[in-house]
Regions:
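Hydrophobic helical segment of the DHp/HisKA dimerization and phosphotransfer domain
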Residues: 141, 178-181, 185-188, 222, ...
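Hydrophobic alpha-helical transmembrane segments and their immediately adjacent juxtamembrane loops
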Residues: 28, 209-300
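Peripheral, non-transmembrane regulatory/ligand-interaction domains of membrane transport proteins
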Residues: 1-186, 192-193, 203, 210, ...
Length: 300
């Protein structure tokens, strides 16, 4: 647990969600109701805001990107912010506790900031932590693309698929965050903010929108690559099937030619000593002619 005072009689309290599991009195002490606790403990909770006017309490669920990959892709986890008159409570877990350290350092550097400046700065810090991961994914995507150009293997295709799936999740998470910031501007409390606090929220929103655009472009590129290689694989499969069809047709020619000699009728060349050689030559000639005709037909 983290407890820090800052600004003019403001306080920040961070509670680890594992502590809430083990010590139920924590959320009672800080007057955190059961619904807020459920939000904090649900790792699949979508980013959103809620404002309780009677209690003058703002609850914000914001998506934080995990530091480590899972199944070769980055995922996000929600972090809960509870903002009151002179108090901000965050509920974190092991996946987003690195943000808590960043927030602690921010307060050490700027101990006199206001409550909402600290709150909006924290949201911006969360957004900024996405950018290095997105840049890393772009480099990884370029590397996978080069490998696929060199050789289209299952391993490389699975790597491309993982990147695409991960990007879908990131686009969804960043869009949710951007919507949350947009909704904050519509709240009644926004009108009571000071100019510096409004500016901080605006800057946070600009960063969030840039992140949405960046992740969306990255996803579009991955989808284009995936579609291109799907077409290439389909064309390769079609070419293979055409080749197998030609081979199947050509393999029937010897049976057709030699089949005449198994009939109880008079067939030319049967009385010649080297008749088998002539028959073989006929078969080869027919196969060559059929090959040329079939290849020209398929190319059309």
């Amino acid at each position: 647990m983290v407890e820090k005072n800052f600004g003019h009689s403001c306080s920040w309290i961070n509670i680890n969600s594992e502590e809430i599991n083990n010590y139920s009195t924590i959320y009672q002490t800080y007057q955190i109701d059961k619904e807020m606790v459920e939000y904090a403990l649900d790792e699949n909770e979508r980013a959103h805001i809620e404002y309780c006017r009677p209690k003058e309490t703002l609850v914000v669920i914001y998506n934080v990107i995990k530091q480590m990959k899972r199944e070769n892709r980055y995922e996000t986890v929600p972090m809960t912010f509870i903002v009151r008159k002179d108090q901000i409570i965050t509920i974190s877990n092991r996946h987003n506790e690195y943000i808590v350290e960043t927030m602690r350092k921010e307060l050490e550097d700027r101990p006199n900031m206001s409550l909402f400046t600290f709150f909006f700065s924290s949201l911006m810090m969360i957004t900024e932590n996405y950018f290095p991961k997105i840049e890393s994914l772009k480099k990884e995507q370029e590397l996978v693309s080069l490998k696929l150009r060199h050789k289209t293997t299952k391993k490389n295709l699975f790597a491309l698929s993982d990147l695409e799936i991960g990007s879908v999740y990131l686009v969804s998470a960043t869009k949710q965050n951007s919507i949350v910031l947009e909704q904050l501007k519509t709240q009644a409390l926004f009108k009571a903010l000071e100019f510096a606090e409004e500016e901080k929220l605006e800057n946070s929103l600009i960063e969030a929108k840039q992140l949405v655009e960046m992740t969306s472009i990255n996803l579009q590129i991955l989808q284009q690559l995936s579609g291109t290689y799907n077409n290439v694989l389909n064309n390769n499969l079609n070419d293979t099937m055409k080749l197998l069809t030609i081979i199947s047709i050509l393999l029937t020619i010897p049976n057709i030619v030699t089949g005449f000699f198994g009939m109880n009728i008079t067939v030319p060349l049967t009385g010649l000593a080297h008749g088998w050689g002539i028959v073989l030559g006929i078969i080869v000639t027919v196969i060559v002619i059929a090959s040329v005709v079939l290849l020209r037909f398929i190319k059309k």
